[in-house]
Amino acid sequence: MYAIGAYGLWALLPLLFVFIEAGPIEILAIRVVFSVFFCLLLMQLVGRWSHLREAVASRETVGWLSLASLLMGTNWLCFIFATTTGRVLEASLAYFINPLMTVLLSVLVLRERLRILQWVAIGIGAAAVVVMTVAYGTLPLLSLLMATSFAIYGLVKRRLGRSTARPLGAIPGLTLETLFLLVPALIAVVLLWARGDLVTGSTGWLLPTLLAGTGVLTAVPLIFFAAAASRIPLSWVGMFQYIAPIGQFIIGWGVLGEPMPASRWLGFAIVWVAVLVFIGDVALRRRERQRQLDVEPRLPGTTQNWTDVSATQTSRPTPPLPKAASARHNAEVGGWQERAVGRPNGRGGRTPKVAVWL
């Protein structure tokens, strides 16, 4: 339910931006301001200020966070521009091809090896881009820019996780990223006001209320996403991510009435085939891992298998995980919980427990 809530709220964002009668720069600037406000409020509730102090004390971490905030701001601006100029379908296309772009970047940057179905999905996605380019006479630059910026943002966040001594967490991370964007956002607001182009505050209470809602819809889905990631397998979270572009497609085509000529239908259909191949690869990979867990190989030259050894080792009492000495300590270190992993081996062995970051 948390994953559905997160991606469902992200899917509804175009409806909010459509009703805001302001330019993309103003919407982005006000969204950053309200996002900072709500993130600081959440930080006060969860009490993880020590995470922020540790992050800003490291030059490397600050550098990666600055790059992440720049990419996030670019993605936000492109999305707002798309939704306020009648191009919601292009935004939807961007998030359909984003997983494929992420996989492609993992090959180019991280030198990872892809499975056959992943290459097939990327090839089909590239064919969709070619079809749309031929049909419209130009590359779908907005969709590609959104997908690429978000994919690079994911790589930067992955690198950022390796540069910190402990996980930064979703809320502290977003707080710092929006804080880095706060000064440019305030400068943009002042310049718009000086030129007489600032709409916020000049048309009554409705527009500021809607703009405040952008801050809520920035922070709340992130909380839901973090809750989902700590409760369900990551592969399931990856499946749920398509709720957002599907919802945006329905809003763009069915609610806002954006045109869908045959060439665009063909391009989207090819992208959907690529997505299905990608999902199929994830499902097959998950099944292979499950099959490997079910296999009980025997030790070489003996009749004893690995789970017998596991039973012997895990039957001994293990020391409990450290408990928080106080509520303040618990708030600072975040939520560590014991969670069972693997399966009971059926031979008297205990299922091991690990500490999971929530």
Locations of the language-model features?
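Membrane-interface helix termini and inter-helical loops of multi-pass transporters
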Residues: 15-23, 52, 84-87, 130, ...
